[in-house]
């Protein structure tokens, strides 16, 4: 006898002729139980009332009857909890504060610590307005009050409207001036003490919203951020505003310096800058070249150390940020030992960020060059840092005196094989006549020769560098000692 017949007889004996499956009301050939429950969800949520308006069945979460609640009996209620005394917390906070300032130490497993308790907040400055210090309650309210009405500069409503319109007009003019980068001419405000000088639009390169969005994407996606600096002027190509942003918003990300273009400066200059910058962050000297590089092994070893610190992750991402034309893409090509990023000796070659695989656990991210806006930087400083393409600059001959200040005379004589110039104009004219770059009437092509000099200056054909602070102090100290010695010798002769 089959199993199905036995089961049928058992149901008849027990009086249950159903097949055992629980069916939902409304289920049929067209709607299955899941669809019916989904449709009933729309109908639910309302209370059911009788004809008198009394609630027969309350809606969900509407019932006023409170069920009996009991605390779950558990042995853990009577065991030790994770507590810490204030002395131990303060001791740990002091130790953590000392190590957080040291950029050569890494905090592992940050999520295991109560960072909200450990981070000390500056309680000296209160965010509230200090109104009571300037004007007390007694001077405003009570029998000794000196104020009878609010302090408004206007005596009537018409004057208030007029003053508001004037302030709004002044604000709109100021914002329009900012948007055009001062192209409307020199503007001065003696009361506020600001002066807006005419500035070429080309000198705003690297400050657009699109490029800053690319930078933020690179910072958010990176575990390690490499700040690429130009070895000739590391402090000039250093983005301090980005460092402050990372220190405040992303303190868990690692930031290191890479001093690129070390082949353009003497060895003692590169060593002095590495020593100076190592006080703030880990610093490496680097020369980007696919065939003959320097510092490649040290950088790869450092990245491997960072990957070993984050063993809980499958891979880490390394982002490259910095000024335009500092060699970010060239460093990536050097690490990969082949051309994976487009490079050029002109700024602005990298337009968007891109991912490159270095090895199984390390990825590299290339970023467009950024220029933090600064009121201290002049057009000459921006041009000499390689931010702007020289062919787009108008009147390039006005920047040649700055080149003569930064470069030694012997280097210029050796590069261009000329000597005996008196000023920048004389230097341009001598070089133009030597190269045969003359216009109609035998006049020198000052604009073309000036662009050539600026390109040679930015691309490393003319040797120049900024002296490190320690070496500059030593130089001043030696000069002072020599002056003291010469003064003593004069006294002895007298």
Curated annotation (Swiss-Prot):
Q: Please list the GO biological process terms of this entry.
A: regulation of ribosomal subunit export from nucleus; ribosomal large subunit export from nucleus
So which domain of life are we looking at? Eukaryota
Chief site of localization: nucleus
Return the annotated region ranges for Disordered.
1-20, 473-494
Indicate where this protein resides in the cell. Nucleus, Nucleolus
Q: Which UniProt keywords apply?
A: GTP-binding, Nucleotide-binding, Nucleus, Ribosome biogenesis
A single Pfam family, by name? MMR_HSR1
Q: Which InterPro entries match?
A: G_CP_dom (IPR030378), GNL2_CP_dom (IPR024929), GTP-bd (IPR006073), GTP-bd_ortho_bundle_sf (IPR023179), NOG2_N_dom (IPR012971), P-loop_NTPase (IPR027417), TRAFAC_YlqF/YawG_RiboMat (IPR050755)
Residues reported in the UniProt entry to bind GTP: 322-329, 366-370
One GO cellular component term noted in the UniProt record for this chain: nucleoplasm
Family per similarity comment: Belongs to the TRAFAC class YlqF/YawG GTPase family. NOG2 subfamily.
The record's function comment reads: GTPase that associates with pre-60S ribosomal subunits in the nucleolus and is required for their nuclear export and maturation.
* The name this protein goes by in its record: Nucleolar GTP-binding protein 2
Organism expressing this protein natively? Candida glabrata (strain ATCC 2001 / BCRC 20586 / JCM 3761 / NBRC 0622 / NRRL Y-65 / CBS 138) (Yeast)
Q: Which gene encodes it?
A: NOG2
């Amino acid at each position: 006898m089959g199993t199905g017949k036995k089961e049928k007889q058992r149901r008849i004996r027990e009086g249950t002729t159903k097949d055992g499956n629980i069916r939902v009301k409304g289920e049929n050939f067209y709607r299955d139980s899941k669809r019916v429950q989904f449709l009933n969800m729309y109908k639910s949520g309302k209370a059911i009332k009788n004809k008198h308006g009394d609630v027969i069945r309350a809606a969900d979460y509407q019932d006023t009857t409170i069920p009996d609640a009991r605390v779950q009996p558990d042995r853990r209620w009577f065991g030790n909890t994770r507590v810490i005394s204030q002395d131990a917390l303060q001791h740990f906070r002091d130790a953590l504060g000392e190590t957080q300032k040291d950029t050569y130490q890494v905090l592992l497993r940050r999520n295991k610590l109560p960072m909200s308790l450990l981070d000390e907040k500056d309680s000296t400055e209160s965010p509230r307005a200090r109104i009571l210090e300037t004007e007390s309650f007694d001077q405003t309210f009570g029998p000794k009050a000196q104020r009878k009405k609010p302090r408004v500069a206007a005596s009537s409503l018409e004057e208030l409207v007029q003053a508001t319109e004037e302030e709004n007009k002044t604000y709109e003019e100021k914002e329009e001036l900012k948007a055009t980068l001062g192209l409307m001419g020199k503007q001065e405000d003696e009361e506020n003490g600001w002066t807006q000088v005419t500035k070429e639009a080309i000198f705003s390169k690297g400050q657009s919203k699109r490029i800053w969005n690319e930078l933020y994407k690179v910072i958010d996606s990176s575990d390690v951020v490499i700040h690429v600096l130009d070895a000739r002027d590391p402090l000039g190509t250093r983005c301090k505003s980005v460092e402050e942003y990372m220190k405040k918003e992303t303190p868990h990300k690692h930031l290191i310096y890479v001093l690129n273009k070390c082949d353009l400066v003497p060895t003692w200059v590169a060593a002095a800058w590495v020593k100076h910058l190592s006080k703030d962050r880990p610093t490496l000297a680097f020369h980007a070249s696919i065939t003959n590089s320097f510092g490649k092994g040290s950088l790869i070893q450092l990245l491997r150390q960072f990957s070993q610190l984050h063993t809980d992750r499958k891979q880490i991402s390394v982002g490259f940020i910095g000024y335009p034309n500092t060699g970010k893409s060239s460093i990536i090509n050097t690490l990969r030992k082949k051309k994976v990023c487009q490079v050029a000796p002109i700024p602005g070659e990298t337009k968007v960020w891109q991912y490159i695989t270095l090895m199984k656990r390390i990825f590299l991210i290339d970023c467009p060059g950024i220029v933090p806006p600064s009121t201290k930087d002049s057009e000459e400083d921006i041009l000499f840092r390689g931010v702007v393409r020289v062919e787009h600059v108008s009147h390039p001959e006005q920047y040649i005196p700055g080149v003569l200040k930064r470069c030694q005379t012997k280097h210029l004589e050796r590069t261009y094989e000329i000597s005996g110039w008196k000023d920048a104009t004389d230097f341009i004219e001598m070089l133009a006549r030597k190269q045969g770059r003359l216009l109609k009437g035998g006049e020198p092509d000052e604009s073309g020769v000036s662009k050539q000099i600026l390109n040679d200056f930015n691309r490393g054909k003319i040797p120049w560098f900024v002296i490190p602070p320690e070496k500059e102090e030593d130089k001043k100290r030696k000069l002072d000692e020599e002056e003291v010695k010469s003064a003593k010798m004069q006294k002895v002769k007298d």
